[in-house]
Each structure stands twice: as structure tokens, then as C-alpha cells.
Swiss-Prot record:
The entry's keywords: Cytoplasm, GTP-binding, Nucleotide-binding, Protein biosynthesis
Pfam families per the UniProt record, alphabetical: EF-G_D2 (PF22042), GTP_EFTU (PF00009), RF3_C (PF16658)
Phylogenetic lineage: Bacteria, Pseudomonadati, Pseudomonadota, Gammaproteobacteria, Alteromonadales
Function: Increases the formation of ribosomal termination complexes and stimulates activities of RF-1 and RF-2. It binds guanine nucleotides and has strong preference for UGA stop codons. It may interact directly with the ribosome. The stimulation of RF-1 and RF-2 is significantly reduced by GTP and GDP, but not by GMP.
Subcellular location: Cytoplasm
Gene: prfC
Stated family: Belongs to the TRAFAC class translation factor GTPase superfamily. Classic translation factor GTPase family. PrfC subfamily.
GO terms for biological process, alphabetical: regulation of translational termination
Positions of GTP binding: 18-25, 86-90, 140-143
Identification of the protein by name: Peptide chain release factor 3
Amino acid sequence: MSGNKVEVDKRRTFAIISHPDAGKTTITEKVLLFGNALQKAGTVKGKKSGQHAKSDWMEMEKDRGISITTSVMQFPYHDALVNLLDTPGHEDFSEDTYRTLTAVDSCLMVIDSAKGVEQRTIKLMEVTRLRDTPIVTFMNKLDRDIRDPIELMDEVEEVLNIKCAPITWPIGCGKEFKGVYHLLRDEVILYQGGMGHTIQDSRVIKGLDNPELDDAIGSYAADIRDEMELVVGASHEFDLELFLKGELTPVYFGTALGNFGVDHILDGIVEWAPIPQPRETETRDVQPEEEKFSGFVFKIQANMDPKHRDRVAFMRVCSGRYEQGMKMHHVRLGKDVNVSDALTFMAGDRNRAEAAYPGDIIGLHNHGTIRIGDTFTQGEKLRFTGVPNFAPEMFRRIRLRDPLKQKQLLKGLVQLSEEGAVQVFRPLDSNDLIVGAVGVLQFEVVVGRLKTEYKVEAIYEAISVATARWVYCNDHKKLDEFKRKCSMNLALDGGDNLTYIAPTMVNLNLSMERYPDIEFAKTREN
């Protein structure tokens, strides 16, 4: 077995997806605790000890207790090496999340057991469906009062159209939460409160009929025996093949805040989740075992280190091996670059990467030449597909308090648009700068980051824009005519792509009827 194959087989690369406040960042903390990456977990809110969550490292995230950017963390667990991508839970940061889902091989879906399936989870699941990504489910917050577990699983099956196979089952909930029964191991794992910041040494009782169980949890023992007969009859058995096709999800119950059940999920991910998978390019599928290096950029993050005003491109390694000092071919630019300072991440902590294998995420220092979706190889002209840009749903005009800082404003906005935090449009017929986002909070983030990172005081104001579409046409004459007649509605985005800015949906529909040879696209491949 080649060294590369051994390394590929060790890797598990997954993202955590959920509705805001379902407990995703808390789970990330506890996962890192089990991976020995943290000595003591910090929880997101109520930080009496000043312990901020390790994965929420930007200033604004620390202030608000929400994850805004995608954090990347690598840690060992048993014999595997886990790459965990923590995605923004807040609904306004969906674009970053969508793109992150293109860089993983499986996902952990976190559900608030008191609320069930929520809107954001539905949308994220639609994105995972595009690639049939395998999903592991964690029903969180068992230390609170929850909905009926069978009802929760029925809802997941009905709303998300995926079969559920319970792996663990809760015994009680809220103040009466006693633990879980592990169906595959035939054992009860007892819950102990007040152990949220450390790893629990849980008591395990083998077998449901064990008299020790009655001594430990009293009348709950008879309840769980009766309940399990019903559950086994009413639910699906775990089937690895269906899981790998994205048709069935193993379901775990627990409490991330109480640090209970998280190790059960990790055990499942390491045992069942796929190793790094082949990746599609425009010309062929790239296999992870191939000798030559290849990878694609799915995210750019500016100013990860405020002291150095830097920008880092996050790259998923798809094949071969990254070695310090190696020469890479930047396909879009047709240039070779020597890379000696790629990074690996433990949230805000960065280390120089000596080697990286398929499934790993490395950071490349970016001086404005790397864009989201760029492919790097060892010479072959490949282009990985499926890293999309989405048309924004909300628009604002950005204005300066100090008109002399126009240059810094444009620079800041273009850099922020290149990292995918926001999209910027420069109308052909005016000096306005229009910013497009998927949610309102993004505008606040942009103004905040312009101030702290670029020393630019800007304000945003309402503008009559309903939507934007990228414009394409193979016939240059027809495109020129369209540009001439519709110039007042045309703009260039941060990458100088022609975009139609529609004041109303009626206007867009009329233009589409009037110019049938012009393509008005909702998404753009990076």
C-alpha cells in the first residue's frame, strides 16, 4: 500500500450544518476536546471565565456569540485524522456555508430537539443533495425538555426526505435525562450532569435486561425496555450502503452543552463516513490516490491575523501530496508558483504545513491573485467544478463619510468580495458602489470590517434593486447592442463579470423576454 493511500484512508473531512442556535459551535468545541485539541472547552455565551469558543475567532463573532466565517480544524481521533469545517450558523452567512459544503466528504447535521427541523437546515440539506453527501444526525439539547424522539425522526424523514436509523436512544430528558441506549452495542451509557467542560467517564451498563440498570435509573429501566421494542419495530436499521449514497442517516441523541453523546458521533464518523472521494473536473474525475498534487480554493479569508493584514485562501487537497517548497501550477493564471509557507489550522492557531494529503485543508497566502474556485495542480490544466457564486438577495449602496477615502473603500470592498463575504457591483453609468448580500447582517459585518481592517468609515443605505443576474451571450454583436441599450442597469462585479442589476422583478422578466439571446444567470461558477 502506498504512503499516500495510507494517509488518504486515515482522513475524514466533514462539516457541521444546522439552524442558528441549534448548538453547532458548542459541538465543535466538544469534538475538539475529544480530539485532545483543547484542554478545556469554551462555550459560546455566558462567558463568565472569559473563555471564548475556540472556533469563533473573529472579533465580531466573539462579541455576538455566533459563527460568521468558516473555521477549519484538524485533530486525531483513534486511528483517524479528522478535518472539521465549522460553518456559519447565522442565516445571513449562507453563501460561505454552501461553498464549504463543496469541500467536505460528509456532514454532521445538528438539530435542536426542542424545535425539530428548522428552515436553515432544510436549505443546507438541499445543497448537500447536489452531491449526495452522507449525513450523520445529532439530536441536541437532551438536557432540556424536548419533543417526542419518534416524532423528531418522523419529521426528519418527511421534511428532509432521508431515512433515519437510530444508533442511540434517549432515556428521559430535561432534568430527568438519564442517558442513552446504544442499539448497536446493546449498552446503556449513563449521563452525569455538570461535566460540560471535561470528558465524562460515563458509567456503561451492558444489556437492557441487566438488573444493574434498575438499580441505576429506577422505573426508567422498564420504560426504555418497552420503548425499544416499539422503536426497533418502527425505524430503519442502519445500512452503510444507503448512508454512503446520502439516502439514510444514523441518528444520535445527546447534549453538546453537557458534553454527552459527542464521542458517540465521532466513533460513527470515523467508522462509517467516507474517506476522501474522487472529484469532478471539466475534463475528468481526479482520484485521491493519484501521485500528482491537485486542489481547489473554496474560501478566501481576509485579515485572519489583524497584525499582518493578510489574506489566506483555503484549499481542499484532492490528490497527491503537498510538500513544503513545492512548485504548483495556478491554472487560471497559467503561472507556476513556489509554495513554502502553506498553513494548517486549529481555528485561530495557524502552523506551517510540512505535508498535506487528500481531504486536508491548507491555507495559501494570497496577495490578491487567488480567487474562490481556482484550481492548483502540478502542471495539468484541470478545473474543478461545483464551487458556485449565488445571486445576492439584498442590496445596499455604500457611501463614505470621508470622500477622500474612495480608493481604500474600493480596495476593501473588492477584497471582501473576493473572500465571498459580500458581492460588490460597480454600475457602468455611475460612481455608486452597490453591495449585494444573502442577508442583512452581512452589511453590518462589511461596514464593521471596513472600519477595523481598512480604516474606512462607511455607511450603507437603501437602494431600489430587487435582484442581480450574471449576463452571458456568445454573439458579441447582440451583447454589444444589449450593453448599449441597457447600460443604466449594468454593472461589473468584483471579478469584472458583467451583471444585470434589476430594480424590480417585472423589469427583469421584461428584459429576459426582450433579449432572448442573452442568458441571465442566478449562479456563476467560480
